[in-house]
Amino acid sequence: KGNEEEEIDRLRQFKHTITFLLGSAEMEGLVSYEHARKGITVLAEIIVRAAFDLSQKSLASRYGEVKDADGEPCNFAIVGLGKLGGEEMTYHSDLDLIFIHSGEGATTGPSVTGAQEYWIKIIQRLISCLSTITRTGFAYKLDTRLRPSGNAGVLVSPLDTYLNYHDSSEPWEHQALIKARVIGGSGSSEWFQQVKDVIHRAVYEWHPPSDLNARIDHLRQRKEKELSRESKHQRNIKEGRGGLLDVE
């Protein structure tokens, strides 16, 4: 456990160091704004993948591997959305993530559990690794609310369940996937392509309602009203009228 905590601290120190170097280089004019955004995004991907590996390592002695009925390793995908998915992170961006696995299976270690339960434990560990505040601060704040059914839904979804969900999901949920991008996980290139295909289908091959524009406009007005909290003397540059959300 002590070694695990040290690895988590090193991960955070690495993140803080590289972020400082990127910021310094941008201020000195050594890298452009666009290249800095790309660098911040790549750094986040590296940290997330390292935290995923560390989370699996920490549970390996208890659960072993997770395999399907044929004895093949179960696959997993970490999908970034928002600024992470669009490769346009800023220095204070949260990480919008969803998690997808290949389906049924069970662990091979002393403690036997199903694939769904195993992956949930892994992701709970990953979230703790990245967002819990310790003496070295925290790495990132994570937002997993864009998963199917939001906070009411399971943290990790089987691929077929994820696909079926988006056959009848809300327009804004399809919209949220426009920038979705696989950034990590475990499995073959074929597996990751399957995930990409499902996301592509959810974004570009669904049948939008006839009043799509009106519904998107209504959602934007609702967010503006509920989140911006603007007044004559106070403006919200991100969520207010004419702010960053409208620009994007």
Residue ranges and their predicted role:
Residues 1-248:
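A nucleotide- and high-energy phosphate-metabolite-utilizing enzyme signature
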